[in-house]
């Protein structure tokens, strides 16, 4: 299994919405991927960050069968649609993938 963690900082305003509104939309669209991509075993997203250093506004944690499944997820058209939105509203991104 491979765990994929991503932390984003968001622009104060983008796409006519506040960072909080865009964070809520990110949570909605990313969690909607559950059960839709083969090899994606678990996904959770939070825009309710208690504390983070460095600062982040949204965090994603997903688990995949293996590295091939992670690569499939990352290239999947439904995931790419999420990526297109996130790129418009995010100002920064940090990610880590590791075997569990």
Residue ranges and their predicted role:
Residues 1-57, 65-72, 99-100:
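Short S/T/G/P-rich N-terminal loop/turn motif that feeds into the first structured element of a domain
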